[in-house]
Amino acid sequence: MKKLLLFIAGISILFLAGCSNGNQSHGNEGMGDSLPADPPLGYVIELKPLGNFSHQEAEQLREELVKQLGIIFNKVPKAELEASVFVGDKKEIPASCFYKPRNRYWAGGILKMLHEEHGGNDEIVTIGLTHRDISTSIHGQYNYGIMGLSFRPGDACVVSTFRLKRKDDLWKVTIHEFLHSR
């Protein structure tokens, strides 16, 4: 029951975040043809495969996210939602993020890399996708393994499948981290 309430609260926040931008202009000049001039959600979501996460897996996640966002934003045409979520180019995780004693990658280092890639453009939220174990320091515990991390608020998130019991739940963790960024 608690999980259901948290999920409903998260969906509500996503809905409100999408509605709060009104008719503002989003000046995406120079960003390429893949970005809509006025994104229906007020931002564009880029899914970026990292390391051994394949482009095909990222595309499957994109389709699931569009489906779930279509349920949330039922008045937004599917074509507009599809234009707001795209799969970016694959990138390697920097070696500087690797923590050898635990065989994990520091999520904060990955977030910094993703943030710097867009130069702080808040209209694009980049979500890094990996199968590797990621970690952060939390609640006084150094190098704690996590499923995802996000700048709050911000323009970058990272999500890992390493700790997921069911790989088809990746879209839930992705939306969870995305909501932190808004």
Enumerate the predicted regions with their spans.
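Bacterial signal peptide processing site
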Residues: 20-22
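C-terminal motif of bacterial Sec signal peptides marking the signal peptidase cleavage site
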Residues: 16-18
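Fold-level signature of zinc-dependent metallopeptidase catalytic domains
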Residues: 41-56
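Metzincin-family zinc-dependent endopeptidase catalytic domain
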Residues: 59, 63-181
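Sec-dependent N-terminal signal peptides
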Residues: 6-11
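Low-complexity, intrinsically disordered or signal/transmembrane-proximal segments
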Residues: 24-26
